[in-house]
């Protein structure tokens, strides 16, 4: 489930920007990167898509990081969606891609990574998983600093002050880190 088309637009825009920058700066190389926000908790934002005027929703209980969600049960959804797709070459391509992405992978992160790679891998897209343990190891010094110094919070407050003539759209918190374990995702508060 990629949710609204925003998922695809973000990736396509990133690939196009990398191409434009390469044309403008031919001696430099630009790599399109898709940051998969697998630690996010907002399943309601991504558990559906619209097709032929109909909303297809994955009705599943969700808690914790969405990337860790099991894809178990999507075979029932696939049957309904397959029927709506009908027959034909394009329908078969979409069915195959859905099966390979969501029915052959055990969690949403792996399924989404596979789908994005199938669609955009030939354009040099690099996919980063925010919940990857090896990636998080590199982030440890920044996490420690954030916990003890509240660096991001201070910078955001400074920026808000500099842009005081504009309406604040998001109110910052002192710590924007979470403790995660299995299906648990809790904000860290001191």
Place the predicted regions along the sequence by residue.
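N-terminal targeting/trafficking signals and adjacent low-complexity tails
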Residues: 1-190
